[in-house]
Amino acid sequence: MEIITHPYSWITLARLAILILTAFLAWMTYQSNLLLKRFQPDFNLLLSPLETIVRVILVGVCLLLAWLTGLPAAQLGLSMVNPLSSIGLGLAVGIVIQVVVNLLTLEAINFFGRHIYSTQVIRNILPGRPLEWLLVPLALLPAVAMEELLFRTLWLGAFRDIIPLPLLIIGTSLIFGLMHLPQGSLGVVIAAGVNILLSLLFLWTGGILVPLVAHYTVNLLQVIVAHFQRDWLEEY
């Protein structure tokens, strides 16, 4: 019992669980990539009730693991300071990131060819009916929250004491990028770059709110931009 109640044992267990959770999500991403190559679903994956339930559960698991570490809320980025200004900063940064990402994506496709990017994911989650314009933004919330809690709160917060930050940021960015493999090699590279920026935002602001809002803004704007490029996507 003494071993179980020792604080260092709890944080070790939490770190092990974070590794297992990340490996599981990476495996699921790989399986999704294989599935999308063989099968194009005729329903919006983002709006699948089962997918949404799983994402909400994963958010809860991330919060549980954060608590299990026993680390201060400030180190995990879970203490809220000036939330309104943080939301405003996150929105501004998210808009800038999305503009840059959109330009880089188009330039890279024109230069390297269409084989470097897959439009399957974005075409699948595009709202097809007016009601889906309400549901898709809502469904993005747990998806973004789960990724931010995992890569910012858990990885940067719980491992920064034992892994040098530059190595931690690069390593998590590679994992984050590979989790976007269904979007093609370009999607992997861009996602890894965005993860580096979000990690720096987390460390600079000391909280998860700014990178979370920025991440959500990027994803939502990506859907909006794709809506106006629907014909191009269908012909891709």
PLM feature spans:
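Short, amphipathic, aromatic/basic-enriched membrane-interface segments that mark the entry/exit
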Residues: 124-125, 138-142, 157-164, 178-187
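Functionally important transmembrane alpha-helices
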Residues: 24-31, 166-179, 184-236
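Membrane-interface helix/loop boundary segments of multi-pass membrane proteins
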Residues: 106-125, 146-171, 200-207
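Alpha-helical transmembrane segments and their membrane-interface junctions
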Residues: 64-77, 142-158
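Membrane-interface starts of transmembrane alpha-helices
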Residues: 42-57, 131-135, 160, 164-172, ...
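Alpha-helical transmembrane segments of multipass membrane proteins
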Residues: 22-26, 58, 62, 93, ...
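Juxtamembrane helix-loop-helix connectors linking adjacent transmembrane helices
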Residues: 41-47, 71-143, 161, 232-236
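N-terminal, membrane-interfacial amphipathic/helix-forming hydrophobic leader that caps
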Residues: 1-88, 167, 223-236
